[in-house]
């Protein structure tokens, strides 16, 4: 659903933000 899609996108965004370059 929409929430699941948003959660996946937000989770990926957080992972990229927190992941050391």
Swiss-Prot record:
One of its GO terms (biological process) is defense response. Keywords: Amphibian defense peptide, Secreted. GO terms for cellular component: extracellular region. GO terms for molecular function: nitric-oxide synthase regulator activity. Its main location: secreted. Expressed by the skin dorsal glands. It is found in: Secreted. Has no antimicrobial activity. Strongly inhibits the formation of NO by neuronal nitric oxide synthase at micromolar concentrations. This is Dahlein-5.6.
């Amino acid at each position: 659903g929409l929430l699941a899609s948003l959660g996946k996108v937000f989770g990926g965004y957080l992972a990229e933000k927190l992941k050391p370059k």
